[in-house]
Design a protein with these regions (language model features):
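Generic start-of-chain signal for non-secretory N-termini
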Residues: 1-20, 27
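Long, highly charged, low-complexity intrinsically disordered interaction regions
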Residues: 4, 56, 62-80, 90, ...
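Short, ordered loop/turn segments at secondary-structure junctions
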Residues: 38-40, 129, 240, 322, ...
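Duplex nucleic acid-engaging cores and interfaces of nucleic-acid transaction enzymes
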Residues: 50-53, 60, 64-319, 323-424, ...
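Structured, non-catalytic alpha/beta "coupling" segments that mediate domain-domain communication
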Residues: 74, 88, 99-102, 227-242, ...
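A glycine-rich phosphate-binding loop feature that marks nucleotide/adenosyl-phosphate handling sites
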Residues: 182-189, 320-324, 378-380, 404-411, ...
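Single-stranded RNA-binding regions, centering on S1/OB-family and related RNA-binding modules
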Residues: 548-549, 553-717
């Protein structure tokens, strides 16, 4: 029987030694970001994504082994555990197989078969299964089992009871069910019908559809599930019943006997009454799990891209949270996100105070030197954008605007966290501030919102919420630790995603900072309540201190590697203070062969390469490689769009069937997966990510339905 280590190694294409090392590191309490960044020699350089996949498989396989142990114990206590059954259970690689093998030994509620057994009909059922009786009349052999006044008072009723026992035994046989499961997966189709064929719904494209289980796209599965849940669709998994019964007959009927007809009837009943409904439920569950797993993957990828967007540093921002009746909330922020001023203006109906709004905004531009206006994309966004664009057109001041996604802003502004951060501000002003800060530092602001609320996925509310939360939390942790965190300015929300730091410890760090002043040395973290040695090991390298006592504290070099880093600087002839002046761009050239130097210093080559890269450009932010934010000075109208028009836009969402792109009109346009590239694209994420700036061509405009079709492939002349 393969070990957990060898199973994972084979599945993920790793060596058993690598897997064993990672498991040991995880069991010692090391986090995935820490292992990925600071234990490359031990793991062979496995990245954080692969490490999380390994961790997930480890958790599943350990749960599987625990379930096997429970099942073996339960069957053994019944005195029914054979060597063959033990071997089959121990060899099982999925939970479903374990449950199939355990099914005959589970306690059952009263069934037709159990009632027949209680009536003493099992010996007759065994005769049917044995197929050894070649002469005689089945009814004559059944007659002695008949009991007057019972449910089995005739030979026919007795034979029915025997068939019920056989049918249940076949349905409980793991090997028969496995064979039929394979047939179902290969041949079954999912059929969809309307509950009311005359009703027009968003699901009418699925009315009367039929598609093989193995080929139906994941997004379609989720759409059909939602339609069924809303009472608009009827869904059925259909398998060729004749083929399934024939397969089961072939497996069960081995020789001629007087019970052949009874056995055939039991086989057909077993499949149609017991096995088929169970397999239909199972296949629907498998389809849903497959679709949800893929949707969670897409959601996680989109969330990672959104969190990794380039910050707009040095911008003084006027943030607008549009609305109609209650007006448009305005927050003015300095380049560090500090609130300078706030008010409410009414550029939209019913007041439509365009002149007053423009005077207020122009005053903020003059008074505070604001150079960017941020507009939320919610209700009233379009009208507000027109007012802002008109203001920009009539001013000589360098000023531009951009649209930001409001998703989750209301969740944050009404949260306990927001009320603790800004107790004197109302909910709406907090929301406007959040929009402005999303531009200045998307990561620092978006971590304050539950990642499920960010809204960059498909059917997120229909997904397994525990699995979604686990995946998204992992993504946020990966991005936060990849970027690094300023220990002296980070919020508790941001600190809580740092490797090794829990939410309570994050609050303790902030409290310590408020009581004792700014951190000047990473070692001060050891004085924070409940931040122990293991937590310090896991978090220290990801927390940066600008202007501290040791210049290395402002880098991603881990304190355990300070001796090696200091020696590298010495051999390069560089003082540590050079790190505060932008680093040492030519340090790699000064050092020569890094491999030889690593051996000389007694550190691993991967670790030394990371140290050298960090000394070249200390505190480098990987988000600087992301596309720049697209700013506008004028508004584009839906009616301006024409087929063939070339535009620049920003990817707002990526789903299984394509990507939605903001091209500066109220409605995002859709680039279908077939229009993403002039080659086959298996999934849109191969080509685009959320936040990407892309060139698109308009291929269609449906003004009645408000839909825009785009292509990233230029039409051939």
């Amino acid at each position: 029987m393969p070990s957990i280590q060898s199973t994972i190694a084979q599945e993920l294409g790793l060596t058993a030694a690598q897997v064993a090392t990672v498991i040991e590191l995880i069991d010692e309490g090391n986090t995935i970001p820490f292992i990925a960044r600071y234990r490359k020699e031990a793991t062979g350089g496995i990245d954080d994504v692969a490490l999380r996949e390994l961790d997930d498989r480890l958790a599943y396989l350990r749960t599987l082994e625990a379930r096997k142990a429970d099942v073996l114990k339960a069957i053994d206590e019944q005195g029914k555990l054979t060597d063959d059954l033990r071997s089959k259970i121990e060899a099982a690689t999925v939970m479903q197989r374990v449950e199939d093998l355990y099914k005959p030994y589970k306690k059952k509620r009263a069934t037709r078969a159990s009632k027949a057994r209680d009536a003493g009909l099992e010996p007759l059922a065994l005769l049917l299964i044995a197929q050894a009786t070649t002469h005689g009349d089945p009814r004559a052999l059944a007659a002695p089992y008949a009991k007057a006044g019972s449910a089995y008072d005739t030979p026919e009723a007795v034979l029915q009871g025997a068939r019920d026992i056989v049918a249940e035994a076949l349905a409980d046989d793991a090997e028969h069910v496995a064979a039929l499961r394979t047939l179902t997966r290969r041949q079954a189709v999912i059929e969809v019908a309307a509950v009311d064929a005359n009703e027009k719904t968003v699901y009418d494209t699925y009315y009367g559809s039929s598609e093989q289980l193995a080929r139906i796209p994941n997004h379609r599965i989720l759409a059909i599930n939602r339609g069924e849940k809303e009472g608009k669709l009827k869904v059925h998994v259909r398998t060729d019943a004749d083929a399934a019964v024939a397969l089961l007959e072939k497996r069960v009927i081995r020789r001629p006997s007087i019970f052949a007809d009874e056995l055939k009837a039991a086989v057909a009943d077993s499949y149609k009454r017991l096995i088929a409904p169970s397999l239909e439920r199972e296949q629907r569950a498998e389809l849903t799990e497959r679709a949800q797993t893929d949707a969670i993957r897409v959601f996680a990828k989109n969330t990672e891209s959104l969190l990794s967007q380039r910050p707009v540093r040095g911008a003084r921002v006027i943030a607008l949270d549009p609305g109609y009746r209650t007006g448009c909330k305005v927050a003015v922020l300095d380049e560090y996100g500090k609130l300078l001023d706030y008010t409410t203006v009414y550029p939209t109906p019913p007041r439509s105070d365009v002149a007053g709004t423009q005077r207020t905004l122009a005053g903020y531009v003059r008074t505070y030197g604001a150079n960017v206006i941020v507009i939320g994309n919610g209700t009233g966004s379009r009208e507000t954008e027109e007012v802002v664009a008109d203001l920009i057109a009539r001013t000589d001041t360098p000023l531009s605007y951009t649209i930001v996604n409001e998703a989750g802003a209301s969740v944050y502004s009404a949260s306990q966290l927001a009320s603790e951060e800004y107790p004197d501000l109302d909910v709406t002003t907090r929301g406007a501030m959040s929009l402005g800060r999303r531009l200045q530092d998307p990561l620092a602001e978006l971590v304050k919102i539950p990642p499920q609320s960010i809204g960059v996925g498909q059917y997120q509310h229909d997904l397994n919420q525990a699995a979604l939360e686990r995946a998204l939390t992992g993504v946020v942790e990966n991005v936060v630790n990849r970027v690094g965190v300023d220990l002296n300015t980070a919020s508790a929300s941001l600190l809580g995603y740092v490797s090794g730091i829990s939410a309570p410890v994050a609050k303790n760090i902030v409290a310590y900072r408020e009581e004792h002043g700014a951190f000047t040395d990473r070692r001060q973290l050891k004085k924070v309540p409940k931040l122990g040695a293991k937590a310090y090991l896991n978090c220290a390298g990801f927390l940066r201190i600008a202007g501290g006592k040791n210049p290395l504290d402002a880098t991603s070099v881990h304190p355990e590697s300070y001796p090696a880093a200091s020696e590298v600087l010495r051999r390069a002839g560089v003082e540590p203070e050079a790190l505060t002046r932008g680093g040492v761009p030519d340090i790699a050239k000064r050092l020569g062969d890094v491999g030889a130097l690593a051996a000389d210093l007694g550190v691993g080559a991967p670790t030394l390469r990371d140290i050298v890269a960090e000394l070249e450009k200390p505190g480098r932010d990987p988000r600087d490689d992301a596309p720049e934010v697209v700013f506008s000075r004028s508004v584009r109208d839906f009616d301006d769009l024409e087929a063939g028009m070339e535009l620049t836009g920003t990817v707002r969402n990526v789903v299984d069937f394509g990507a939605f792109v903001d091209i500066g009109v109220k409605q995002d346009g859709l680039v279908h997966i077939s229009k993403l590239a002039d080659r086959f694209v298996k999934h849109p994420s191969e080509v685009v990510s959320v936040g990407d700036t892309v060139t698109v061509w308009v291929t269609g405009v449906d003004k009645d339905r408000g839909k825009i079709s785009l292509s990233m492939v230029k039409a051939k002349a």
